């Protein structure tokens, strides 16, 4: 199926009578602080990154078994819907498994992923952007090029990691200090022309995941720029469509947009061509963006994930689109990740939580991770058999120490994310709010925490 931009343009340019009862459409934006970029470019860029991150970037994988890759065994896999092309030539974009799209596709929009250590724990998360987004005429297109986004405090360790694994790979690795990344929310549904009928799932996501060759992927990226950021082709370097833990039936209106460093306000680049109504540009404080993300249960960056502390499946990478692959062969940290997935033995997951009296936690360092307790008793676990009497037992047995059910990982105001035992997550999903608490390490105050997955759900695959 070839991408036909005229079909979508006709759908996007429908005009109806303006309705003053609609709220004014808004373009919400925030420059994300503390982010840095590393460029990886060259004929081996895809193979190089595919062996280091959790996402699958190569449609062709030479495998001897699920855990080894042997270049002497030519068992080449390629999905029949993906057209044949040389991964080493041309700036063709990025391959996505399509774990939520019923099949793989080629795109020029980025992928969320992670670097793991040898024990399978997350070193850092990353967004991998094909760059530049729209490949302006005259742009270098001889080889694939990708931008890796990470926290600025981790860019040096990440660069060293890449250089250490480079060996004989034909890639160039360079830090990019001339870029900015923006959180953008495009409120298309509020335009009166659409009468609240716009759907990012139908109008953007479905066309994007139907593209199976590099030419259609490039046309789609150029169409996106022309429709939403007309005239800004040379200043938009990359884009990521953020669907992490959003309702899969509706999808998201959130993008990460990478621009050249001379862009002081991305709202000045926003120029929607499919509507005539005026758009209100709103600059959103970063704390609001972060709290909204925490309400979805999404951690981001080494300051929140804390390097080498959690497994990718514990922070829900398997629930995000194309963030982790279980059949692509070897990559650093793959063995434990694949085994955990295959055996189904995962005891904890991250979940959004509501913090009561959060002011008492404001003075704590962001690195503090407090044990999470609850007095709630799950009925099935409350009927354990009585221990057999022993003549050697103490007459005054010590009371059992209360065991935590998880850890509070991150808090901003009343919004937080906790790593919680799965049994409590399932209970909250079926029965509603579970009251928990943490104890302030300095004051001893008991701070209530609520797990309420009926109001702040973890969205499972469709």
Curated annotation (Swiss-Prot):
The keyword Repeat does not apply. It comes from the Eukaryota. One of its GO terms (biological process) is iron-sulfur cluster assembly. Residues 382-405 are annotated as: Disordered. Residues 1-11 form a transit peptide. Keywords: Mitochondrion, Transit peptide. InterPro entries: TrmE/GcvT_dom1, YgfZ/GcvT, YgfZ/GcvT_CS. GO terms for cellular component: mitochondrial matrix. GO terms for molecular function: transferase activity. Residues 382-394 have a biased composition (Low complexity). It is found in: Mitochondrion matrix. The keyword Transit peptide applies. Belongs to the GcvT family. CAF17/IBA57 subfamily. This is Iron-sulfur cluster assembly factor IBA57 homolog, mitochondrial. It comes from Eremothecium gossypii (strain ATCC 10895 / CBS 109.51 / FGSC 9923 / NRRL Y-1056) (Yeast). The gene is CAF17.
